[in-house]
Amino acid sequence: MPRKGPAPKRPLVLDPVYGSPLVTQLINKILVDGKKSTAERIVYGALEGAREKSGGDPVAALKKAMENIKPSLEVKSRRVGGATYQVPVEVKPGRATALALRWLVGYSKARREKTMTERLRNEILDACNGLGAAVKRREDTHKMAEANRAFAHYRW
């Protein structure tokens, strides 16, 4: 087995419009089949729509939405004896951001609006206000961790 350790993280190229690493990560998460310009058009359109609807800085709205979506706890399966327990563990910051982006994009795709730009804009605005499916997913994750608090001593 190789003993070099994990590969170093590659630096993130910031997006040209907002210069925000979060916007870059969102673009990369929406990216399908390598069509970066399409992904950029969707994200920038959604952020412009968010600016028009909320009247504020769209990147600040996205950051607020991400804070409302990011989980602080999750459950991981742990096998002890013959039983499998759902053990609550804290979520590392990088994973919390990745999960939040995954949920934001996933629940945006599931919405009923006509274009992906509209769906993403409305999901961001809903999450900003503490509403929406992505925020509900975070609450469900926290509820699950709270319900399995008795197994917290199985942490590793």
Curated annotation (Swiss-Prot):
- Entry keyword set: Ribonucleoprotein, Ribosomal protein, RNA-binding, rRNA-binding, tRNA-binding
Matching entries from InterPro entries are given as:
Ribosomal_uS7, Ribosomal_uS7_bac/org-type, Ribosomal_uS7_CS, Ribosomal_uS7_dom, Ribosomal_uS7_dom_sf
Top-level lineage group: Bacteria
The answer to keyword Signal applying to this record is no
Q: Name one GO cellular component term.
A: small ribosomal subunit
Molecular function terms, GO-annotated: rRNA binding; structural constituent of ribosome; tRNA binding
Q: Which GO terms describe its biological process?
A: translation
Q: How does it assemble?
A: Part of the 30S ribosomal subunit. Contacts proteins S9 and S11.
Q: Which family does it belong to?
A: Belongs to the universal ribosomal protein uS7 family.
Summarizing the function annotation, the protein's role is: One of the primary rRNA binding proteins, it binds directly to 16S rRNA where it nucleates assembly of the head domain of the 30S subunit. Is located at the subunit interface close to the decoding center, probably blocks exit of the E-site tRNA.
Tell me the PANTHER family matching this sequence.
RIBOSOMAL PROTEIN S7
What is the name of the protein in this document? Small ribosomal subunit protein uS7
Originating species: Renibacterium salmoninarum (strain ATCC 33209 / DSM 20767 / JCM 11484 / NBRC 15589 / NCIMB 2235)
Organism placement in taxonomy: Bacteria, Bacillati, Actinomycetota, Actinomycetes, Micrococcales
